[in-house]
Structures are given as C-alpha cells and as structure tokens.
Amino acid sequence: MLPADNGYYFLCSGHIYFWNGDVTKQAVPLCSRPNCSHTTEDCAAMIRDASQKMYKVDDGFYVLSIWPREDSKTGEKMMPIWRVQNDGSGKEIVGEIPDASVVNYTVFQDKIYYTMEDIRTDGNYQFSVWQMSLDGKEKKQIWQGDLYSGYISTLQGIGEWLYVSESGCEEAIDWTNEDNIDFEKLPTRTNLYLYQPQSEEWITNPDEYKKEDVLLSIQNIYQNEIYLTYYDSKAEIRKVWKKGFDLEDEAQFVGEFPRKAYKWDNLYGYTWPDRNDEDENWFEIYDYDGNLVQKIDLYPHDDIDIISADEKYAFVYWIQAQDGVGQEVIGVIERDKIATHEAELIQLTKGMNGNSFER
C-alpha cells in the first residue's frame, strides 16, 4: 500500500489500483487508455501473475511478475520486472530474474534485491540474495545462506539497512531416507542478517533483536518503528517487540497475542476466526491495556490479512469467490469509526469482469 498526496496506490488481483481515499468510491485500475476493459495484457494496470509487492521509484511503479517468459536466445525461463508509469500511460519490462518456485524481491535505495533458490544435487536447497540495477543491466550476488531447505521470511529495506531473515536446517537433510526423518528433531534455527549497501557491510543476528528464541517475522512498520513477532512454541503464543530504525535502539516488549498482531495508531488488531463456528470470523481490536475496543464481523470472508495501516485506515486483503473463481480483494476499515463502534469492512475492489469498474 503506497500513500500519495491525493490517495493510495496498491496491487491486487494482478492490477495496480488507485483509490482517492473516499470510502463511497471504489478503487480504479491505474490505466489511462480509453475504453480499456482492464482484462488484457495491453492494459497498463495489468501485470499477469503479479507478486503481492509493489514499489515506487520516481514516476514509476516496479512490480515482479511470477509468470515466466522464455528467453528467445537461451531458452531459460525468466520472470519479468515491470515498470508502470504512475499516470497509467504505459509499462515496460526493465529487468528479469530466473524462474524459481520461491522468490522474494524488494526495491531499496534505487536497487532491486531478490532471492534465488539454489537446488543441490542431494535434494537440499539454499538461498542467495542478488542485487540488480533499476534498468536490469547490472546484477551481482551479495549473500549466500548457510542453512538448508528452509525459507526467507523477510527481504525488506528499513531505514539504512536491508533486512534478510532466513529459517532452515543447520545441516543438509538426507532426503534418501525421508520416510524415517523426524522433522521435529532436526537442528533448525532462524538467522537475521542486516546489509548496508553503501559500505557493503553485513551484520548477523545483532544483539538488539535477540529477544526471544524464534523470530517469526518483521510484522509491520508503523511510524518509524519496527514491530517484530517471535513465537513461543511451548505456550503457542506470539510475542511482539518494537524498536526504532537505528540499529542501536533498544527493543521494547509490546505484548502477547494468539495470532498475528498489527500495530495501528494506539491500537492493536488481529483476525480471529471462530474454529467452533465456521460462520464466524472476526477482526478484534484492542488498546494498549489489552481491553477489547471493537469486534468487527468479517464473515463470510476467510483467510483475511491486514496488509497496511495508517492514521486513517487499515487495509485488508482477502480472497472472494466470484463466478466460481477466487478473486483477490482489498478493503478498508476506518480508524475514526472505532471509537463509536461503527467501524466495518468496506470493499474497494471488484472482480475483473468487463464493466465492473464503471461508476
């Protein structure tokens, strides 16, 4: 979710949208072509199989498509990175990265960073991080992971540092004996790496982040503070800490939550489906003291995720069935309606069916 002077830009269902901040209006695809149906690839707003992340640099948006294209010279499958003009007048491919089953990417300090999944002959895989220029002409490997068969949960620029969080096994797994592997007893760990592009300095597991055993993720960034989620497997609870952007800033404990918690002004919220009643799904909002402020009914939607929040809105993502096909949807919850218990989920996008965007 990218704020602008006159509204917000966001990526949903393979399209870039603009929303002017009026809850009585829907978001519209970022395309200035007259009479465009926004359903074909010549639409400026449409990026086929777009990843869920979008970045703005100068007058353009950078979006990775995970739909691979075959290189006419080498035959190698490559995933294109598109640059879309911020007025919706056009788009172009500025770079490509090799096709991979799992990929993370980000744009930070005028460089593109992405992960590569390196498959070994013994069936294990490891991750590496690569840096690419914005025009796609220069690229180099800057990091090689030392864990096996895991995942990268964070690749994100924050302040002056690029954050890389990797989880995996400390030793190669014998996949030839897979039926007898006790996965719970494998020596696994999570490492946090910080990279400073100017000095090309790497820091591994800085002390400021060693607050709990397992760092799940950098949950969200809110007003120059980083919210970190750790998991206590014994208590089956998530513990949240916060710290400033400066590396030396001491982290402070926020609280314990049963599910992913999202910082929102002076409140915290998380989705909470009722597992005893499949017809119930809620977004619960609490104050600093743990008091319930409002419980917003999200049914019939499920698998809802809060993707961003500012002083006015929380932006919500979910999958909605339409004509037998799952459609990605974005909605908002108004911050100022919570005090009066009038907040509700407002849908901003519809499916890509012909004229569904007409007013």
Identify the meaning behind each predicted range:
Residues 113, 141-158, 163, 167-168:
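Extracytoplasmic/periplasmic C-terminal soluble domains
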Residues 215-220, 226-232, 237-238:
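N-terminal leader/targeting helix
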Residues 1-4, 40-57, 99-109, 147-159, ...:
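Repeated scaffold domains used in trafficking and secretory/extracellular systems
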Residues 49, 53, 68-69, 166-171, ...:
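Intrinsically disordered, low-complexity prosegments and terminal tails associated
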Residues 4, 12-13, 23, 57-58, ...:
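Short loop/turn segments that connect beta-strands within the blades of beta-propeller domains
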Residues 15-42, 70-97, 120-145, 173-211, ...:
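Surface-exposed loop/turn elements that mediate protein-protein interactions on large endomembrane-trafficking
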Residues 10-11, 62-65, 113-116, 163-166, ...:
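Residue position within the beta-strands of beta-propeller blades
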